[in-house]
Amino acid sequence: MPRLTPIVNYRNIGISAHIDAGKTTTTERILFYTGVNHKLGEVHHGSATMDWMAQEQERGITITSAATTCFWSGMSNQFSSHRINIIDTPGHVDFTIEVERSMRILDGAIMVYCAVGGVQPQSETVWRQANKYNVPRIAFINKMDRTGANYFNVINQIKDKLYANPIPIQLPIGKENNFVGIIDLIKMKSIYWSEIDQGITFEYKEIPKDLMVLSNSYRNILLETSAEASEKLTEKYLYKNLTEQDIIEGLRIRSLKNEIIPVTCGSAFKNKGIQSMLDTVINYLPSPKDIKYSKKNKFLSKNYKKSILPKDNEPFSALAFKIANDPFVGNLTFFRVYSGKIRSGNTVLNSAKDKQERFGRIVQMHANKREEIKEVRSGDIAAAIGLKDVTTGDTLCDPLHPIILEKMEFPEPVISVAVEPKTKSDQEKMSSALNRLAKEDPSFRVSSDEESGQTIISGMGELHLEILIDRMYREFNVRSNVGKPQVSYRETIKSCVEEEGKFIRQSGGRGQFGHVWLRIEPNKSNIAKNKNNYTFINKIVGGAIPKEFIPAIDKGIQEQLSNGVLAGYPIVDVCVTVFDGSYHEVDSSEIAFKIAASIAFKSAFMKASPILLEPIMKVEVETPNEYMGDVIGDLNRRRGIIDGMQDINMGKIIISKIPLSEMFGYATDLRSQTQGRASYSMEFLRYNELPNNITESIINSNQLK
């Protein structure tokens, strides 16, 4: 079957934002104006297409990334039909994993900002994730109708907080209640949307006289920005005039190189600015043909020598970026095709696990609705039914042309709770449910406390775990008792120590003999490229320890990293060197050297000024002025450090750094202090050394368990 849409007309985009910036409403308007939906879905009514989970509809927030497809030919039908594959991602920091894996497979992104709140903590997190994968972006400054809206303030924040180069291609006409339309700086026309038909129709008019000077000023910036894209455009700018198409061409070149961020504006809720923003997606975000899929941009693993070409006649390659459990069809594997094509019933190689898998059925997803299709090609995003052993980040490829795409990296959990089923008969059901949820969400971990036998679940925040426990009940009918949240501390050292470890058992018959000297020191370089930032160095010379025993020494140390020494928490940021030792020709074995290494490591660790590290969160509290003193006092009591304050309409944003352990229950306390008028956001910042008195308390508490 021939391709219906040329790949040059594909746009694989994500829509990302801080919570409450209006991202899902923006997506709903896109679906309405592109004809996918025939009525407007509203977040506050619980009727948003993309927020289909019960928890999303109840809470009015996005929890899981949702995929859909629409087609767009331009406001004035100036384009041939373009296929836009959209992934709507969560705005809450607890679900940042959904943004991470979406950014990995997207070609472009729309960053939505609230015209009042501007660039907020999760906006910065999402920006870093987009930078990591070098994703070209446009900005949509939403909620221009809200009290306190300030378009130019948000542009300055994009510049100052995100270190980006925002280039306005539109200006708002009015603001707050007087926001009525936009000025298109490329056409130099104003656009007004009809309020009678929900913004479906619009008209171009002349720019209001009182905005002409401002428009000309920003138009000149636009012309200069575009002219810098190439010598041809520079010459034309200097000696002739740039046409509308020249300006778009120059901005596109620079946008695809991530040199600029085209900025648009509007009000999704008031049905203004969405169609013109869609035109911006077509003009300035890349098609798959514009992206280089190679080792150089960290797309391919280092072992692969070629680049991937997004052509249908190339060998098949795809990345599985999400696993979801569907109550009707079982596991759904979401994947992005980079080259070639695949039909339902075909067999592919999961090169990450070296296993072949059969594509049972292929479906096109529209939020939680499935449309069965027979074939997908390069550039497509779809889901497969029937893949048995695929996990997030696995490469699927032609068995005759194996390839490995660079795997995704996921953040380590920062919070844990103990869970147990309300009835013993549900123990097996709970284990099965938790394992299925963990397969879906790589930032969610399930483990067992060896001493107490309790099941421990770990995640990115209180809300993250609360949602997963709720899902366990709704989707798997397992009720559970949940313990108090526990912080995921880390252990490390501050000094360098050399230590000997011996394990000798020689009491008749075959004995055991292992003898090592280890040097352990802080690993501050962060070059280890593993989650613990652990480096192992072998400096044995002269055969003091045979080569075959060196891996056992490394293994003995790594087991201690997982179990901890000081208080039972994972050990991070250590470099261990084995530099001497001895062996017995008959009695030495792998197990003996493994135990000897463990003995030496534990002893050295306790002598190397061990400390506990705690997760520190960046917390931003938005509060009316009259409660500012109470809020700051409470943050100080929580061991918070105030980094700064920003003025907002009738209030302040207080920016602080606070240990996660002090933030449990903060939402309730803040509501109480401010009569429900303040709000806060929080994201993980880094690990810091724990004060001595709290360290001693935690060690003593863990020893009593």
Swiss-Prot record:
Record GO biological process: ribosome disassembly
PROSITE patterns, A to Z: G_TR_1, G_TR_2
GO MF: GTP binding; GTPase activity; guanosine tetraphosphate binding; translation elongation factor activity
Listed GO CC annotations: cytoplasm
Subcellular location field: Cytoplasm
Domain of life: Bacteria
Keywords tagged on the record: Cytoplasm, Elongation factor, GTP-binding, Nucleotide-binding, Protein biosynthesis
Signal peptide: none
S-S bonds: none
UniProt binding sites for GTP: 17-24, 88-92, 142-145
Domain tr-type G: 8-289
Pfam families for this protein: EFG_C (PF00679), EFG_III (PF14492), EFG_IV (PF03764), GTP_EFTU (PF00009), GTP_EFTU_D2 (PF03144)
Membership in a protein family: Belongs to the TRAFAC class translation factor GTPase superfamily. Classic translation factor GTPase family. EF-G/EF-2 subfamily.
Function: Catalyzes the GTP-dependent ribosomal translocation step during translation elongation. During this step, the ribosome changes from the pre-translocational (PRE) to the post-translocational (POST) state as the newly formed A-site-bound peptidyl-tRNA and P-site-bound deacylated tRNA move to the P and E sites, respectively. Catalyzes the coordinated movement of the two tRNA molecules, the mRNA and conformational changes in the ribosome.
Annotated protein name in UniProt: Elongation factor G
Phylogenetic placement of the source organism: Bacteria, Pseudomonadati, Pseudomonadota, Gammaproteobacteria, Enterobacterales
GN (gene name): fusA
